[in-house]
Amino acid sequence: MYSNMLVSCSNCRTPLQLPPGARSIRCAICQAITHIADHSRYAPPPPSIPTTPPPPSTIAPPSPYNHAPPGPPPNQHGRKKAVIVGISYKYSRHELKGCINDANCMRHLLMTKFQFPQESILMLTEEETDPYRIPTKQNMRMALFWLVQGCQPGDSLLFHYSGHGSRQRNYNGDEVDGYDETLCPLDFETQGMIVDDEINETIVRPLPQGVRLHAIIDACHSGTVLDLPFLCRMDRNGQYVWEDHRPQSGIWKGTNGGDVISISGCDDHQTSADTSALSKITSTGAMTFCFIQAIERGHGATYGSILNAMRTTIRNTGNNPGGGDVVTSLIGMLLTGGSGGGSGGLRQEPQLTSYQPFDVYTRPFSL
């Protein structure tokens, strides 16, 4: 009777596929249980004279699980939601040391500097005890869907990823360089990577007018991993031009009126460092560290000032990987313990992509 039936989670509104005959289902994102009424027990009411329908109730039914995340509370400026993914690939030949540190630092930054409610931040790392918050391919897909689900004008969304990135040959003609950029979930060797086309379809194209999305991507080959139409090409003097990356195939890669900007760790042909040369305490992703430091040191007024500050820090580290004190109060507070393996010079240039060109030195940065 319920074959292929879709229902919405009673708490976070994520669409769920109900198994045949089931009377309830647990949401993989927020863990709330949604109960399904069996309408087959009741005969339809007889036809009656049309009357004016009562006004719809404004009181939402309570969640059956009080401990389930209720979602970000609405306010006059809209809601704030974030998905933060940090993958260390522990005990594998792909292991990274800094990615879970990146995730913890980013969560703290969002809560303390940008007033993101803790309950509106969905963390996916190997340290999570909830199996639905382990950064597998399926869980990452569901988290990205949750991020944009039900968004409304005034909402501010953020996606942060720290982990491996890669690229693969593109065959549909929608990439200027001939390659699709990819993110590597924890189980990518068996389940495959998440391709930029899918990320664009999930969190970029559906975004309605009045909603803002920022992506902070600390991974190799990540310059255009959201497949946004325009890339800001900036030189060492801070001069920039916007490159048009709209595919010749005519496939639309923009939004449904929303505002999307991505700051990524490096260009599509570059690799992104996992290093202890920056924090001097433990390994972090170079890009994540430099982004947080730019905000902490007061360089977060505009997108141009952030990008310049990040690039300067990485260049200085590349020229002098062993010197200089660049530990901010936030990093120093969050990161404890030692790490092995420093880094040589860093060869990467953080990139900015957008759904449309804008003046990076006059547009205020805001999350």
Predicted regions: what is each one?
Residues 9-12, 25-30:
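Short cysteine-rich clusters marking metal-coordination/redox-active sites
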Residues 17-19, 36-37:
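Short, non-ligating residues that shape and space the ligands of small metal-coordination modules
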Residues 18-26:
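Short linker/helix segments within small regulatory modules
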Residues 24, 43-46, 50, 59-70, ...:
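Functional beta-strand-loop-alpha-helix junction segments that form "active/interaction loops"
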Residues 30-41:
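Short Cys/His-rich micro-motifs in 6-15 aa windows
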Residues 90-104, 108, 277-283:
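Glycine- and acidic-residue-enriched helix-capping/strand-helix junction motifs
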Residues 133-162, 166-231, 298, 304-306:
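Caspase-like (clan CD) cysteine peptidase catalytic core
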Residues 196, 200-206, 210-331:
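Active-site-proximal C-terminal subdomain of hydrolase catalytic domains
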